[in-house]
Regions:
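Asp-based, Mg2+/Mn2+-dependent phosphohydrolase catalytic module
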Residues: 1-8, 16-23, 41-46, 90, ...
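N-terminal helical cap/lid subdomain that shapes the substrate entry/recognition surface
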Residues: 2-112, 116, 123-124, 137
Length: 256
């Protein structure tokens, strides 16, 4: 089967954080606290932060073990209940989620080769989609829009929306169904051995591991290709689309 579509991871594949994660997370918490204070909820920042972090870390641990996603809105609502504060309505919880993620959205920036790679794949006639493990569907769309690349993707599937995480096959199957291609016609590009590479393999997709920096992983990596940039990934995809099973040499890894 010839390739018809490319599905990609988002964080650390197309975009990267411009600030340390701890700084970004603290800014998120401050933004959430400020929003709640404006609503008239009186809460000490340090106490609320301690409660929130405990719930956030528990949700993250559950996600890691069971591959389920607890969306940020649920985490915020639980933190308010634990703080013995009035639980906000659905609309206000959604707004609180948006305010929490605003600093983080601004911190995610494109890799230098992202736009040209996406443009090359689009010009090659390939459909594209995103599968992202994230606690906020809104944040994923906002990161794509802020960086000017949302228009490249006909399909955007998040773990927050699905409430399950990569590498579970259901999230890949949903994206394949939405984009309208078979696994054999689709390649997945991502940076995580466990979430991206093993997840794609479970549903019969070819995969490309984008190894931007050395990693230590207990999960065996068996991608069809390993590259160090999106440029190399694009050239590998073009080779597959043209029917070649060979990996391009480094000299061939330049976009036209």
């Amino acid at each position: 089967m010839l390739l018809q579509a490319v599905l990609l991871d988002l964080g650390d594949t197309l975009v990267h954080l411009s600030r340390p994660w701890d700084d970004v997370f603290h800014a998120n918490l401050e933004a959430l606290h400020n929003y709640l204070m404006k609503l008239g909820l009186r809460l000490d920042f340090e106490q609320f932060a301690e409660t929130f972090i405990r719930i956030f870390e528990d949700a993250s641990a559950r996600a890691d073990v069971y591959k389920v996603e607890i969306p940020m809105g649920d985490i915020i609502a639980k933190a308010l209940r634990k703080s013995k504060l009035e639980v906000l309505g659905v609309d206000l919880i959604r707004d609180a989620e948006v305010e929490f993620f605003r600093p983080e959205v601004e911190a995610w920036q494109l890799y230098p080769d992202t736009v040209e790679t996406l443009a090359a794949l689009k010009n090659d006639g390939l459909k594209m989609g995103i599968i992202s493990n994230a606690k906020s569907d809104w944040a994923v769309h906002a990161i794509l829009e802020k960086n000017g690349i949302e228009g490249f993707f006909g399909v955007i599937v998040t773990s927050a929306f699905m409430r399950i995480r990569k590498p579970r096959p259901e999230i890949f199957i949903r994206a394949l169904t939405d984009i309208g291609t078979k696994p054999s016609e689709t390649v997945f590009v991502g940076d995580s051995v466990e979430a991206d590479i093993s997840g794609a393999r479970k549903v019969g997709m070819r995969s490309i591991h984008v190894l931007r920096r050395p990693i230590e992983s207990t999960h065996p990596a068996d991608p069809e290709a390993t590259v160090t940039s999106l440029r190399e990934a694009a050239n590998q995809i073009t080779a597959w689309k043209n029917g070649s099973l060979e990996k391009p040499t480094p000299d061939e890894c330049s976009l036209i």
